[in-house]
Structure formats: C-alpha cells, structure tokens
Amino acid sequence: MKISVIPEQVAETLDAENHFIVREVFDVHLSDQGFELSTRSVSPYRKDYISDDDSDEDSACYGAFIDQELVGKIELNSTWNDLASIEHIVVSHTHRGKGVAHSLIEFAKKWALSRQLLGIRLETQTNNVPACNLYAKCGFTLGGIDLFTYKTRPQVSNETAMYWYWFSGAQDDA
C-alpha cells in the first residue's frame, strides 16, 4: 500500500463512504481505575459523518492507494500542545477490515514523530465501537469523555465524544 499527500478535491471522493452501521454502543462508567467501557447491542442504524468544509491551513490530507485506487484517507494537523490531531480517517467500504485504517494510523504516528510532536489525539463517539477497538489495538488510550459535545445537535445528541491519545515513547503516559 502506498500513502501519499492528496489534494482536498481528491479526498472528497471518499466523503460518500464516511458512514457505518451501528450495531453496538459503549456505555461509559467511571471507576477508581478510570473509564470502564461495556458494550450494549442496539437496533442497527446508519451513522453518517457530516463533512465540515472549514479547511485548516495547518492540515495535510493523505490518501491510501492499492493498485492506484484510492481506498482510504487521513487528515492530520499539528496542535498547540505538541500533538498531531487526526481530524478525519475514512476507508472505502470495500476495503474496511483489511488493514487500511491500521496503516493510516501507523503513517500518522510516523508523521507526528517526523515533526517532533509528542503524540496524537483524535475524537470519536461511543457508537463507533469498531474504530475504538482499532485505536486501542494501535496503542491509543482513552483519555477523556465529553457528555455534552453533541447535546446541541438533535441528530447526534445521544452520542458521547471519546478522546483517544497515543504518546511516543519519549512522553510519559497520561
């Protein structure tokens, strides 16, 4: 697989694929050990991510290609606290579960380290269990939950924001 920078117009071709079917959600509990997650089955429904058109001058978008076909994209930027931020990660439906997202995340780690950033942050939601499982598998730690991020948006007010972090070996774990 080849990963290279792509213009936003090319990246937008995957926006129609930026959805998934929710079959389970995380219930979040706070314990003495931190956040505990338990999964709960739900009636399947489609979750669509709405693209925000506010482009950040500090961001770069990279595409993952297999046999010259764009199969995934990741948008990265640097943040004020010496972390990279994964703003968007999308994999075409036909290539999900085949290691594309894992490769994009590993690329993001190298990208962050090449810029002397100390780690990576990203946000997802409690209804994106497959993505959360992937982030944990890739060495990310759940660092925060925000119960109110989506409260003002009726179409997503039942979702809870989850903030995941990966720190390079040079940084103490949070």
UniProtKB/Swiss-Prot annotation:
Q: Which UniProt keywords apply?
A: Acyltransferase, Antibiotic resistance, Plasmid, Transferase
Gene3D superfamilies cross-referenced by the UniProt entry: 3.40.630.30
Instruction: Decide whether keyword Transferase is in the record.
Output: yes
Q: Domain N-acetyltransferase, which positions?
A: 20-170
State the Gene Ontology BP annotations.
response to antibiotic
- Acyltransferase keyword on record: yes
Q: Which domain of life is it from?
A: Bacteria
Recorded GO MF terms:
acyltransferase activity, transferring groups other than amino-acyl groups
Top-level class of the enzyme under EC nomenclature = transferase
* Its EC number(s): 2.3.-.-
Q: Which family does it belong to?
A: Belongs to the acetyltransferase family. GNAT subfamily.
Q: What else is known?
A: Encoded in several related transposons, in encoded on an unnamed plasmid.
Q: What does this protein do?
A: Involved in resistance to streptothricin, a broad-spectrum antibiotic produced by streptomycetes. Detoxifies streptothricin via acetylation of the beta amino group of the first beta-lysyl moiety of streptothricin.
Q: What is this protein called?
A: Streptothricin acetyltransferase
Source organism:
Escherichia coli
